[in-house]
Amino acid sequence: MTDNRVENSSGRAARKLRLALMGPAFIAAIGYIDPGNFATNIQAGASFGYQLLWVVVWANLMAMLIQILSAKLGIATGKNLAEQIRDHYPRPVVWFYWVQAEIIAMATDLAEFIGAAIGFKLILGVSLLQGAVLTGIATFLILMLQRRGQKPLEKVIGGLLLFVAAAYIVELFFSQPDMAQLGKGMVIPALPNPEAVFLAAGVLGATIMPHVIYLHSSLTQHLHGGTRQQRYSATKWDVAIAMTIAGFVNLAMMATAAAAFHFSGHTGIADLDQAYLTLEPLLSHAAATVFGLSLVAAGLSSTVVGTLAGQVVMQGFVRFHIPLWVRRTITMLPSFIVILMGLDPTRILVMSQVLLSFGIALALVPLLIFTSNATLMGELVNTRRVKQVGWIIVVLVVALNIWLLVGTVMGLS
């Protein structure tokens, strides 16, 4: 009887700890459903139907492993990835890493900020510039929560993640995808032509986010409660739940685009405005509105996450700190320049995702090296199987990027 009571008590304590440590992965997961994903997934679904769904499935599984490794590094060492690189690599390498990480963070933020601005434009009927102003104001308000600590921000961003997931459940209901074809697309790999390879690289870039690899290790480095092993166990649950939601959203985006556009002959849908305007007559005004609202929610939350990641990168690599509002102001400028110059915002979104895919290996290689170091990690060091899978992911990413670069140079994409 006493043993049962102790067992129940320890079980409740474990669940309580798991709940208390839930949150960091939800902030990281928001980076996986940003407006760049909308643009890339819609274009892929409209152009190739369900044929590229397998890329989303595998990219999401890779992302799960990567985020677990990132979170584990913070738990085991009390330092984030940028700080570990600063401590272990020569100064020129550290400065190179800092510059490329800042460029990638800004490219990410460009996609996220413009995506939210497009969402405001679509649902409110304002200009893109006015939508950008609204986005700026909204992100400043959300960032103010950071003054109250990490938990309030986790709750708001987690809520926005769940809102986007709910929105895509509604979109699936409206679009009625062919479940047999959807299932086939998820499990049977296909790259029918060079354009599909280009979009597959974009999907990979949109799904595995370099800036959140840096951020997640920072979000877990100050976690308290339980042993390191217990914190790691709770974090695996956190990552599994958050990334499953993000993976569902990405699959639903592409499946909705395939069902609504590809199979109705609208295979040329390549921008978010066009997607919104085409959804209304094809499905309903409600479907188009839900799409616009989900775009705003994803854009606002992910641009906040991008700002936080940029701060982590700067502090970690070069020990330099600027107020969040200053960083937010600076990183908004490229978005306003793109809008004022009249550049195609959706093309900018897709190109930014391709750029991101080049930063994945640069973040992954040191992450794998550090998490495989028994001196640093102790009992949380990577197993041989994890090391093998990790290096396979690096090789795949690099190979896909070389293919993408060659294809782009030759004018195939």
Swiss-Prot record:
InterPro entries named among the record's database cross-references: NRAMP_fam
Membrane topology according to the record: Multi-pass membrane protein
Keyword terms, alphabetized: Cell inner membrane, Cell membrane, Ion transport, Iron, Manganese, Membrane, Symport, Transmembrane, Transmembrane helix, Transport
Cellular compartment(s): Cell inner membrane
Gene Ontology BP terms: iron ion transmembrane transport; manganese ion transport
Principal subcellular localisation of the protein: membrane
A cellular component annotation (GO) from this entry: plasma membrane
Annotated TM spans: 20-39, 52-71, 96-118, 126-145, 156-175, 197-220, 239-258, 277-297, 328-344, 351-370, 388-406
Ranges in the topological domain labelled Cytoplasmic: 1-19, 72-95, 146-155, 221-238, 298-327, 371-387
Sequence ranges on the Periplasmic membrane side: 40-51, 119-125, 176-196, 259-276, 345-350, 407-413
Record-linked NCBIfam families: nramp, Nramp_1, PRK00701.1
Family named by the database record: Belongs to the NRAMP family.
Reported function: H(+)-stimulated, divalent metal cation uptake system. Involved in manganese and iron uptake.
Protein's name in the database: Divalent metal cation transporter MntH
